[in-house]
Amino acid sequence: MTKAIFFDVDGTLVSFKTHQISPAVRQALQALRERGIKLFLSTGRHLAMLDPVRQVFDFDGYVTLSGQYCTAQGQVLRSTPMPPEAVEELVAAARTDAFSCIFLEGEEIYINCINEMTRQFIRDLSIPMPLQRPADYARGREVYQAVTFLTRAREHLLLDRAPHLKTTRWHPNFLDVIPPSGGKDRGMDALLDYFRIPVEDAMAFGDGENDLSMLLHAGIGVAMGSAHEEMKRQVDWVTGTADEDGVVQALVHFGLI
């Protein structure tokens, strides 16, 4: 019996075209709440970047920064920054190979350099451009996640130098960088433990590589129609895209609305 549902944001709940949750999905979320199902966001975004979504619907909890910072009912349930050696590796790689990197702390968000690739990222997510700071600023600070602007052809510039980092990709132009112990599945566990819900009673929706650990961990994992084919082969169900209200399609299929 499904008692909790975790939703990725970009490309799942929110369309990359409209940057909004559709009326049909909002209606479905309200119907789920009326059934007593706990509803959570699970995203690579910082909590400060979720205001447009939170203004539309008040979720029961938040897995943010790809599982590194999780909150519910005003409490911090998981707070796992990168180890200092991982931050050093990241800073050194960004300086040596001069790639753009967004550093996400608990309170601060900053970027070392701005170019057309980073501007497109900001447009795609419809968020403000972070404050610009040199990469060295991150040294000795609590960094929970970074977004490194490296295509697949250039990702070796980071991966070859950073054994203490874990990376996931949900876009051709950038990688999410988190601690080795990180992931959305870890964040899911933090919220499920808090609400005393077994993981087999959880459902999860996502479309990117950074969602896969969560989809495989949940009792039911649903991939959006925009997900990669390899990801689709590993999950329990494949639904439509965000622009096709794929979340609603899957909820109807599983008899939840």
Residue locations for each model-derived region?
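Asp-based phosphoryl-transfer active-site loop
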Residues: 3-17
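Active-site phosphate-binding/coordination module
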Residues: 16, 23-118
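Short, acidic loop-to-helix structural element flanking the phosphoryl-transfer center
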Residues: 18-37, 80-86, 128-129, 182-193, ...
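Residue-level signal for inorganic ion chemistry
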Residues: 32, 43, 146, 188, ...
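Phosphate- and divalent-cation-binding pockets in alpha/beta enzyme and binding domains
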Residues: 48-52, 157, 187, 213-214, ...
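Short, structured coil segments at secondary-structure junctions
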Residues: 57-58, 66, 161-164, 217-218, ...
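Conserved acidic, metal-coordinating active-site core of Asp-based
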Residues: 93, 97-217, 226
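Asp-based, Mg2+/Mn2+-dependent phosphohydrolase catalytic module
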Residues: 217, 222-257
